[in-house]
């Protein structure tokens, strides 16, 4: 919250913070090279790119059924709760579909911008149990829900291993995808099917340096590609 132009409302209500364990698929998306790019860009160019970020989240809210989102400057986090979709495989289905929609739409938009733009989104996806925090404090403006837990940290860290137009999936997500290939990886659709790729040693070495990343995710994460769109639109798969 930007406090300079906002007032906080004080009430006589007692503060209470409720927590509930929920299973989620979480997507972290971040524009690669944004910080360096912004050093030589005009404010209007920067705001145009940030507008693209906001537009993507608004679009995803309508068509990809996420439960929660939060803007993070030149990126954002999206969360699908299992209970909203029936199974974690279904939540992951929507998370992966949204990830590649983000890549596809940014590619089209970047091609049409009248100035050089950041390289593309890097995306990290993690699955598992988190705690949803629902605060009810005596300051209503602060009562926004939030999520905490290992999958949140894992997704944020794995996102750093994704290059432009790259998508990284944690070990739990990989296990879910391999057990539900038709739903998660869309294997029966030649155009929409996704593929998992094991990371090479350089990526594993980088993952090993991330504080708090569990061993299963250091060695068990995978890159996800959409072969049809990759071959049609861009020639990178995001692997570092």
Q: Where in this protein do the model-derived segments appear?
A:
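Intrinsically disordered, glycine/charged-rich C-terminal tails and inter-domain linkers
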Residues: 1-12, 131, 139, 143, ...
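Catalytic NTP-binding/metal-coordinating core of nucleotidyl cyclase/transferase enzymes
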Residues: 10-94
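Beta-sheet entry/capping signal
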Residues: 24, 66-67, 122, 165-167
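Substrate-engagement module of ASCE P-loop NTPases
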Residues: 56-59, 101, 106, 154-160
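Catalytic core of nucleotidyl cyclases, primarily class III adenylyl/guanylyl cyclases
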Residues: 64-91, 108-148
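Acidic, metal/cofactor-coordinating or nucleic-acid-engaging core segments within structured domains
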Residues: 94-100, 105-111, 115, 166-168
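Amphipathic alpha-helical transducer elements in NTP-driven molecular machines
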Residues: 96-99, 148-155
């Amino acid at each position: 919250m930007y406090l300079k132009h906002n007032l906080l409302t004080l009430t006589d209500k007692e503060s209470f913070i409720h927590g509930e364990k929920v299973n989620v698929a979480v997507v972290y998306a971040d524009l690669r090279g944004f910080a360096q790019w912004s050093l030589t860009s005009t404010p209007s160019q920067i705001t145009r790119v940030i507008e693209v970020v906001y537009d993507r989240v608004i679009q995803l809210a309508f068509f990809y059924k996420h439960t929660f989102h939060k803007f993070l400057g030149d990126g954002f986090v999206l969360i699908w709760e299992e209970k909203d979709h029936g199974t974690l495989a279904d939540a992951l289905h929507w998370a992966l579909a949204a990830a590649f929609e983000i890549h596809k739409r940014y590619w089209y938009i970047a091609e049409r911008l009248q100035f050089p733009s950041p390289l593309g989104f890097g995306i990290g996806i993690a699955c598992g149990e988190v705690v949803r925090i629902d605060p009810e404090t005596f300051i209503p403006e602060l009562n926004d829900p939030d999520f905490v837990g290992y999958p949140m940290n894992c997704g944020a860290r794995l996102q750093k291993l994704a290059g432009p137009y790259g998508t990284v999936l944690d070990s739990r997500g990989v296990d879910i995808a391999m057990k539900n290939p038709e739903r998660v990886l869309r294997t029966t659709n030649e155009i929409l099917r996704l593929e998992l790729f094991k990371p090479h040693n350089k990526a594993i070495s980088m993952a090993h340096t991330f504080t708090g990343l569990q061993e299963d995710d250091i060695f068990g994460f995978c890159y996800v590609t959409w072969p049809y769109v990759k071959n049609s639109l861009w020639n990178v798969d995001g692997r570092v």
